[in-house]
């Protein structure tokens, strides 16, 4: 143990370890449903506690965002996590620019955060989306950057948020594949992106029962011992 205060540490890695230790302890030992749900969200909307997720304060903000939406809507969380500073660094979207696209976040957004990857039925076609859809989603997410000083506050969560760099956004129409009914998102729409309208357009299957069932199975497997303890106490 240490008597030093975290704000006296120069090592960001040490700060992150302290924050994650505190959070893990609560997630694993507190019997409240909210802690369990927050831990469950972390298994899907994951960032590393180590280097590659920004400062310790960004990591703390990320954990607070999961806590805020523990009882909330997973579709709304998927929108908010897009502007999460830690996530922007961890999945490289802060490096996603119109002239140099980075598809890492777009791929995870579709495969893990929203509609899930289905059976591969053709080259680059995963039933629920295709490689073309990843490319178009990356264009939608281009220009969303980390705000290092945490000065932008989200009005819904009251937590620090990333920013929009208009000059780095791909300012062309985005046309998706047959998996999205060949939908085209026309420009200009960037002024409404922060409200999640454009992001919503690539979440058409987020309420698919397969996603709900898959997530419930994951949650039950992670916490089945907790359910037993709760049942024994009723």
Annotated model-derived regions:
Residues 33-37, 49-57, 100:
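Short, flexible active-site-proximal loops enriched in glycine and acidic residues
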Residues 17-19, 28-36:
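Amphipathic interfacial helices
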Residues 3-15, 24-28, 52:
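Post-signal peptide N-terminal segment of secreted/secretory-pathway proteins
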Residues 2-5, 19-23, 56-234:
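Active-site substrate-binding loop specific to GH73 endo-beta-N-acetylglucosaminidase modules
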